[in-house]
Design a protein with these regions (language model features):
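Membrane-interface helix-boundary signature
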Residues: 13, 17, 37-40, 69-83, ...
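Internal/C-terminal transmembrane anchor helices
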Residues: 106-139
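Membrane-embedded alpha-helical segments of integral membrane proteins
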Residues: 47-102
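Cytoplasmic membrane-interface segments at the C-terminal ends of transmembrane helices
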Residues: 31-38, 91-113
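Non-catalytic, solvent-exposed segments at the cell envelope interface
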Residues: 131-456
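Short, Lys/Arg-rich, polar N-terminal cytosolic tail immediately upstream
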Residues: 1-11
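Hydrophobic, aromatic-rich membrane-embedded alpha-helical segments
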Residues: 12-51, 88
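Membrane-interface alpha-helices
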Residues: 35, 39-48, 55-56, 64, ...
Length: 456
């Protein structure tokens, strides 16, 4: 007769081990406290509580948008990725140490082994997600943010030899040229579909937006010469004629707009139209209150058409429809000037949707994916927190909107060699600049807000 080997019942012990491990997964040290091991409990809990306290304090002292802006700055982002990895290791050690309770010698049973493995996976997953999004953000910076030599690796209509322009001093206005690039398959060359100068006053906490007509001709280049064709072709023209524009098309366009307005253009931001659609979708769409119906049976492209229309009243628009609203100009009573006003309207709505209600945090993954392949800027990444604070603080009531229309420009007539164009009137432009580009801390003078779709 052979003796039968009896295996001990490890179920109750495994359950206790797992419960302690789960507690330490929630907060390192809790499992050790459950196991009545005070010294290990304090060793794991105190650093964890200090870290949580620092995070809580940061959220109390800063808005979520500001914190996010600080966090995604390249230097800070690299540090946070390292901290994330260290916290993961710390939590896993705490989980394993709580699971291996010395009061219960012997190997854990199947329940304990499988349970511990599942718990390790659950603890690791959020840290892996943080690393994925962090690495994605860092990759985006490399593609979008050009360094001092303009060496960003992505974005529309890249300039092989672009160079940065003059930079603002401390407390000075920051002037950014925003370019919407139309490089669709029907185009033989990329054109700037929209040109908007955005001027930030960091002292007075105000914003001035000036839309430049894309059909503007005879624009000064800032070197004594004049660009005779339409301004929306300068970017592509300069990039194809490197001998005449050795600094590239973007710098040529910055210099031209700066000379036109008589103000320095410090930075640029380029977004192609397909990327704009994706950006709007990434923040969940934008809210627009349409004052006059728009309709164009021939409009199409970027997921809309043929034909597009919109009725009077509030609308929540996705990316394709927001782009259509900003671009349509062949509707009754509409033209390039009313179109420019609608473009500013959509930009403000995009800003509102991105920063209000903490939506920016949830929109970040899609937004990063959108801008990574479709945008480029030489804005310094280390000033992102400052710009984020301005974007969050400055609403529509502190934004001055200008569309460069008559008397700042005049018609080129019916027989102009470049077709339907407008010609700048320097004196009137200078008068506008004096009113809305005031010294830092001085509010811009009153200017009639453009009404892109006034009620009939």
């Amino acid at each position: 007769m052979h003796a039968r080997r009896v295996r001990p019942d490890t179920g109750p012990t495994d359950q206790r081990r797992l419960f302690a491990a789960i507690l330490s997964a929630i907060l390192p040290g809790l499992g050790q406290a459950f196991n009545r091991r005070r010294r290990p409990a304090a060793m794991f809990a105190i650093p964890s509580l200090v870290l949580l306290g620092v995070i809580w304090l940061l959220f109390q002292l800063n808005s979520s948008t500001m914190l996010l802006a600080h966090a995604i700055a390249p230097g800070t982002l690299q540090l946070l990725l390292v901290i994330n990895a260290l916290v993961l290791v710390w939590r896993l050690i705490a989980v394993f140490e709580a699971f291996v309770d010395r009061r219960y010698p012997g190997k854990p049973g199947r329940l304990g082994g499988v349970g511990l493995l599942v718990l390790i996976v659950l603890v690791t997953l959020p840290h892996a997600a943080i690393h994925f999004y962090g690495a994605s953000a860092f990759s985006t910076f490399e593609r979008v943010f050009a360094g001092p030599g303009g060496d960003a690796t992505g974005g529309p209509e890249d300039d092989p030899g672009s160079a940065t322009g003059p930079k603002p001093g401390v407390g000075e206005r920051v002037n950014v040229l925003l370019m919407g690039i139309d490089a669709g398959p029907s185009r033989t060359q990329a054109l700037t579909d929209s040109l908007i100068v955005i001027s930030l006053d960091p002292v007075g906490r105000t914003v001035t937006m000036v839309s430049i007509p894309r059909d503007l001709v005879d624009v000064p280049l800032g070197n004594g010469d004049t660009f005779a064709p339409k301004i929306n072709s300068l970017l592509g023209w300069a990039n194809r004629h490197e001998s005449e524009f050795p600094l590239g098309g973007t710098r040529a366009l910055e210099d031209a707009i700066g000379a036109l307005l008589g103000v320095p253009i410090h930075y640029y931001a380029k977004v192609d139209l397909a990327g704009f659609v994706t950006m709007v979708d990434a923040v969940g769409g934008v809210d627009i209150d349409v004052a006059r119906p728009l309709s164009d049976k021939n409009y199409g492209g970027f997921g809309v058409g043929p034909g597009w229309s919109i009725t009077v009243g509030p609308h929540h628009l996705d990316g394709a429809n927001a782009l259509a609203y900003a671009r349509i100009r062949r509707s009754t009573g509409e033209n390039d000037f009313t179109r420019a006003g609608r473009q500013q309207e959509v930009l403000i709505a995009l800003r509102d949707q991105a920063v209000e209600g903490g939506n920016f945090l949830f929109s970040l993954p899609g937004l990063l994916d959108a801008v990574g392949d479709t945008a480029r800027t030489d804005l310094p990444a280390d000033r992102l927190p400052e710009f984020a604070a301005l974007a969050e603080e400055i609403g529509g009531e502190r934004t001055t909107q200008v569309v460069m229309t008559s008397p700042m420009v005049k018609s080129g007539g019916k027989n102009h060699p470049y077709g339907s164009v407008v010609i700048p009137v320097p004196k009137r432009i200078a008068e506008m600049v004096a009113i809305v580009f005031t010294k830092p801390g001085t509010p811009p003078g009153p200017w009639p807000t453009p009404k892109p779709t006034p009620k009939p």
